[in-house]
Amino acid sequence: MELERWAQLSAAVSAVAADFGRHPRDTYSTATIVRVHLWAALFDRSTSWACRAVNWKPCTRPAELPDQSTMSRRTRRDDFELFLEQVGKRLGGKAAPGLVRVVDGKPLELPNHTTDRDATWGRGVSRTSVGYKFHAVFSGGAMPDAFAVTTLAASEKDMAARMVGRLGGHGYLLADAHFDASWLFDYCRHHGFQLVCPRAKPGTGTGHHYVSPHRLRAIRMLEPPAGVNTFGPDLYARRTDIERQFSQLVCFGGGLTTLPPWVRRIWRVRNWVMAKLLINAARVRLNRKAALSA
């Protein structure tokens, strides 16, 4: 199964490499650096493991493998990040995003005794934890419509606003009660989206401060009188789609589970998460092809 996913990843890397420039002083192409990084992530191993030829299948191994120091330096360059983004677009397909999108965050917790200088304390899974957080907007594609990796202390509302600003299009954005803020409703509407989330304090009034008219609309959608209009509740029932997206992202071999000991510092976490998203996109594409041929 790993080799089937690798075939998808390798084809996408080759397609991007065909039009991707190369610095004249580079010994190894960016495509080779990306292949080594993805091979390590596919098998949940460190980069140094993937730098040894014995750990590759002969049919998958590049002609030459970089050493660990080269990988450490090259994976922090902008061209490496740009290459990964283009591979993500290739695996994500050309389907237009849906009118209904869902936003949420997934904590990436570290042990409490971690010495990672970038990790911060914040709200984890039902407790205060230290680590990072993966923020994402999904609409059913193989890749998220937008995502970001931050420290755990970063505000989910602020990150939602940043991702909405990059989305484009229009429609409904479903979220949980943690995103209930009038300024965020106005910001989403300015970018073409109606934020739909329950009140942080249900069953109470709206207070005497400024209340966004778009927040009032969401309240009317989710709290219809006597259940006469079920459009809002039926629409919001789709918010569980992101829970399935997050669960499917971790429920297979090679998925985004806990961060391994060698993934510390923010740039390594971002590269690791991106690799796992690409691997998951390859898995989704294979599953959809199998479903169509069945």
Question: Over which residues does each language-model region extend?
Answer:
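Basic, amphipathic alpha-helical segments enriched in Lys/Arg and hydrophobic/aromatic residues
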Residues: 232-294
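Major-groove recognition helix of helix-turn-helix-like DNA-binding domains
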Residues: 61-79
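DNA-recognition alpha helix
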Residues: 47-62
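Helix-centered, glycine/charged polyanion-binding patches within enzymatic domains
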Residues: 182-252
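Alpha-helical architecture
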Residues: 65, 102, 174, 241-242
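Basic, short loop/linker segments at the boundary and entry of helix-turn-helix/winged-helix-like folds
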Residues: 1-43
